[in-house]
């Protein structure tokens, strides 16, 4: 879940050949952040309630923090936001959160509004207006929900497959990638570019 201390050479190889590696600020940002990756579906599938899921996320990330930063005098090891803030206050290394399938609870528990609200409260408390956050990136199918007066987590820019501006050039497949995939799977490029026809 937490990437810290990966060798500089490994991280350079990770980005080798990508456009980002040629950016003037690439070196400036390399190895400057703690990265926490969470796949929320993995946590949800191992628990019965939202409270259990949040507790498991807290336990897992907390354990990673304790392993990476054992020398810190943590205020309260049971409160994730306190632990993250303690790490940031001691080392001044901000966190990047990558949260995959952030919306899994909305898809699997559609009618459980109380659980959904608790989950949004957890995310808001974890991410919104926190000095330890450099960036949070969440993937999912559904847009970020708002509940009446409950502002939830309204600090995100939302991009979709149908409206990816201004990052559209970085999403989907380039023509060259489509050609390579067609060659790899022995498909006709003409066949791929034709719209799908459905039987009536």
Spans of model-derived segments:
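Structural recognition of the conserved hydrophobic beta-strand(s) that form the central parallel beta-sheet
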Residues: 98, 134-141
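P-loop NTPase motor core
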Residues: 11-63
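Conserved nucleotide-binding/hydrolysis micro-motifs of P-loop NTPases
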Residues: 22, 41-45, 103-104, 141-148
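Substrate-engagement module of ASCE P-loop NTPases
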Residues: 86-88, 117-136
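Conserved P-loop NTPase catalytic core
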Residues: 145-189, 193, 197
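Single conserved hydrophobic/aromatic residue that forms the stacking wall/gate
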Residues: 1-10, 190-200
